[in-house]
Amino acid sequence: MRNIIVKELNQTYIEDIDIEIVERKGIGHPDSISDGIGETVSEALCKMYMDELGGVLHHNTDEVQITAGESNPVFGGGKILKPIDILLTGRGVSEYDGIKFPLDRVAIEAAKNFLDDTIINLDVELDTVVECKIGHGSGDLVDVFKREGAPSSNDTSFGVGYAPFSETETLVKATEELLNSKPFKAKHPAVGEDIKVMGLREGEKITLTIGCAMVSKFVANREEYIAVREELKDIVSDLATKYTNREVEVFVNTADNDDATDESGYYLTVTGTSAEMGDDGSVGRGNRANGLITPCRPMSMEASSGKNPINHVGKIYNILSNEIAKDVVENVEGIKQMNVMILSQIGKPIDQPKAASTQVILEDGVKLEDVDKKVEQIVDRWLEDISIITENVVQGKTRTF
């Protein structure tokens, strides 16, 4: 019998609170690059182990550190003066049952492939130095994956999720995803991948402040830069009408000095990421598992990216909590909003958490007894089928940042 708790949440519905703040760090932000590398390396190790053994050995690659390089962007060109240093750390298994694995090579290759796919104007071989210092784990750590039934939790920890997204949350995420989409880059090559979107809702007005690294070789002069910046404002303003009827005001690169006639007054980069010139990055300092940073919502400080998808509850429970919340809100009538918190105990099966706590805001006229059994059933089903989370992560079907 699982300890599933359903309680009514005595809290104002997200759309009715006076102030809401939402942030998303885009795929080219140094923290997001770190998240992406950590997760991609984990996926590559999973594939390596699966191909050889049919199962996944212990690993965690959630300790990626980016130390920024140096660059000299100029209108119409520029160059990298010092490459970006990327350090891969964590733990993995390089030998098991007489089989040796090329752990470091696979990790470095995965990191470089991610950079190639993600930062279009980055020359990975010339402009980055990728170093692997992933430690080699002991056989004792591997044993946990060989037990019968659900894997045992590797830690006493918790995961948090909620649903549905608010209008502001949806708009913030959609804005970054549009600006960093492949079709958009093809039409607007001057727009780099290092994009941060900060959303503020004050009552019925939403303000979006966007920091966007411009790629210097595609911007010939000050006038072209300003034209691209102003076009971005118009594009995002048009996008906003698809997600909200509220007033939306858009700002882009507010630190620019339009009185400057040279590059010094503008957000120019050679590669499209600030990691080239002074902005460091680490796993877990950016987006949560749902892709957002949401101080007005319950959040876990746990970094999901790079953690092993077999029994690391810091990853599994954060993803699972969001899936449960979405499922309940979409399929149980009468629930306006839901929070989910799942707590593990180290050594206990991950499908038997110490507590699976849910909190619901109900529609007017709906009572808790009208929905609690349905909520319990959905939570129980997800815990019973928790391996789906692992399978989706291993196959790269689930985003963790």
Curated annotation (Swiss-Prot):
The metabolic or biological pathway listed in the UniProt record of this protein is: Amino-acid biosynthesis; S-adenosyl-L-methionine biosynthesis; S-adenosyl-L-methionine from L-methionine: step 1/1
Q: What is this enzyme's EC? A: 2.5.1.6
Swiss-Prot/TrEMBL keywords: ATP-binding, Magnesium, Nucleotide-binding, One-carbon metabolism, Transferase
EC main group:
transferase
Cofactor(s) listed in the protein's UniProt record: Mg(2+)
One MF term in the entry's GO annotations = ATP binding
Top-level lineage group: Archaea
Q: Could you say which residues bind ATP here?
A: G135, H136, G137, S138, G139, D140
Task: Tell whether Nucleus is among the UniProt keywords.
Answer: no
**Similarity annotation:** Belongs to the AdoMet synthase 2 family.
Recorded protein name is: S-adenosylmethionine synthase
